[in-house]
Amino acid sequence: MKKIFLSLADRSASNYVYEILKEGFEEYEIYGLTDEKLEKIGVKSVARYSEISTVGLIEALPKVFKFLKIYRKILKNLKNTDTLIACDAPALNLRLIKDARKLGVKRIIYFISPQVWAWKPKRAEIIANYCDHVIVILPFEKKIYRKFPNLKVHYVGHPLVDLVKPQKTKEEFMKAFKKEPLPLLLGSREGEIRRHVKLLKGIIEELKKSFDVISPTFREFSKFIERELKVKTLTYEGASYDCFFYSKASLIASGTASLEAGIAGNPHVVYYKVNPITYFLGKRLVKVPYISLVNILLKEEVVPEFIQKSSDEILKGFEKVYKNEEEIKEKLGTLKFILGERFVIRKLRELFLEIV
């Protein structure tokens, strides 16, 4: 039985991989960095990626020793692997693809390119030198890798085109609220959720006068959010998609959720806060004018961005978005066409099976 090792470090990558691997891979032994969802479809866990997942240089320091311990475990398991699928997570995977090549892994696939177009463009060269295939999920990324003749580059669209769809009917969703719902997305990692709760606590009370503020999140964070902000949380699968389809506007921490909201046609404000040192270093390195993929793809600031800004500035930004929601919604309508046609998951599954 051929062996596939999965290396990933965040929930978005896990969601895409879950959808791809849940059918057609019965003849393969798949193991690696996992979560509960991946384990349910038979992926064997070497470690949970949540143990090493973090954002920013300063934020990562407390997890260094844990990371090194898990990394040694990964290398031990890679020795008899036929295929490595490295998903995004450049801090982990750019080192891992080099070590995998040294260990004699036959086939190395990089799925979801690091954002080399935003910063550290030399990472593309590292991927080209150590990988056999790169599968990109943004239309303009294919061009970046075309200059490397020995690397096979693939693009079939963005998985979110298939995945972003409502789970409940509007009537079923709305009956839980007395006021208009206002989705609040705080992030997917514990550190960023804690920072954003602290940042937004002051304006949530103000917003609750006019809206039912709801926070779609993961089960492990729901009690903390409910206790600190006194808002309702939603933890069922696809809750954020229902929020985006059935609300007029949202407050969203920068990340995949902004693109999901954009695909759903939901006007929103993008905010984010990191350690000041991380922000200072990042600002010097990043080469793109926007942080949200929505704005990058549409080539203008359709959804306003508030990075390292005060809660009052974020509140004013939200009020402006809410007033202009129809205009913003119209501009968001072109995103699906930019990101590819439907059946992206099926095409990715077929591509992976062809490669491995």
Swiss-Prot record:
Presence of keyword Lipid metabolism: yes
A cellular component term, taken from the record's GO annotations: membrane
Annotated GO biological process: lipid A biosynthetic process
Keywords assigned: Glycosyltransferase, Lipid A biosynthesis, Lipid biosynthesis, Lipid metabolism, Transferase
EC numbers for this chain: 2.4.1.182
A Pfam match: LpxB
Reactions this protein catalyses: a lipid X + a UDP-2-N,3-O-bis[(3R)-3-hydroxyacyl]-alpha-D-glucosamine = a lipid A disaccharide + UDP + H(+)
Family under the similarity heading: Belongs to the LpxB family.
NCBIfam families on file: lpxB (TIGR00215)
Protein name as it appears in the record: Lipid-A-disaccharide synthase
Natural source organism: Aquifex aeolicus (strain VF5)
